[in-house]
């Protein structure tokens, strides 16, 4: 089997009450196929039911499928089919009402995405402090924002080298992705739709100046 279009008549373990349940129904209907639903309450229950043979396939967010497969006794005996039947971006979340912390979390991620766009990595970030690109210099805390006399960190309650420290210690978005969940890890996820907009895909970030 190499495609979800071959799943007519399959039994599917699916977590009830989720958007995945609705997306699956739409996909099968749009492709003129039928399926037998095997309802479960949690991802762990879906894993157990699938491994016990209660269903032919198991569906959830793609990242969840890859993570589950990595924990199976023999991951190579299972495949994640290539079709992406819906696009539901996942990202960091914080407690409601803590807007300052939400800004820090949001811009920490954005800084890593901008760094990838600019070609800034954990290995060249010191060299990039000598860049001629104004946005790179502001991101790394070398230059201030206009005539404010302040760096981006001031609007987040952080030092101006906050983004530099993230990139130096963690890397840009690509480095972090490839290190923790990329194709050379047990989870083995390709960038796919998580690639940058300049590669004709989804990821980009606003400028920190939008925050100032």
Question: Where do the PLM segments sit?
Answer:
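Bilobed "Venus flytrap"/periplasmic-binding protein-like clamshell domains
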Residues: 1-47, 63
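Extended ligand-binding regions for polar small-molecule ligands
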Residues: 11, 16-18, 64-65, 82-164, ...
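A ligand-binding cleft/hinge motif common to bilobed small-molecule-binding domains
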Residues: 23-30, 51-52, 56-80
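Short beta-strand->loop
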Residues: 36, 71-86, 96
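Alpha-helical segments with a strong preference for the paired helices of cellulosomal dockerin domains
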Residues: 45, 52-54, 212
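Detector for small/aliphatic-rich hydrophobic stretches
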Residues: 178-183, 187, 197
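Conserved small/polar residues in nucleotide/adenosyl-binding loops
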Residues: 203-210
């Amino acid at each position: 089997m190499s495609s979800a279009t071959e799943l007519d008549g399959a039994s599917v373990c699916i977590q009830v009450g989720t958007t995945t349940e609705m997306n699956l129904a739409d996909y099968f209907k749009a492709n003129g196929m039928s399926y037998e639903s095997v309802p479960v309450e949690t991802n762990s229950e879906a894993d157990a039911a699938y491994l016990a043979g209660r269903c032919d396939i198991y569906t959830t967010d793609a990242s969840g499928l890859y993570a589950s497969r990595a924990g199976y006794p023999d991951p190579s005996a299972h495949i994640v089919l290539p079709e992406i039947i819906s696009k539901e971006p996942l990202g960091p979340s914080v407690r409601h009402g803590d807007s300052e912390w939400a800004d820090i979390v949001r811009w920490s991620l954005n800084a890593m995405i901008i760094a990838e766009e600019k070609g800034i990595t954990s290995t060249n970030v010191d060299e990039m402090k000598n860049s001629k690109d104004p946005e790179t210099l502001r991101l790394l805390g070398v230059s201030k924002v206009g005539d404010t006399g302040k760096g981006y960190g001031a609007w987040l309650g952080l030092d101006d080298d906050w983004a530099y420290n993230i990139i130096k210690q963690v890397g840009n978005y690509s480095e972090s992705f490839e290190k923790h969940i990329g194709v050379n890890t047990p989870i083995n996820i390709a960038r796919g739709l998580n690639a940058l907009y300049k590669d004709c895909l989804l990821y980009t970030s606003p400028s920190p100046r939008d925050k100032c």
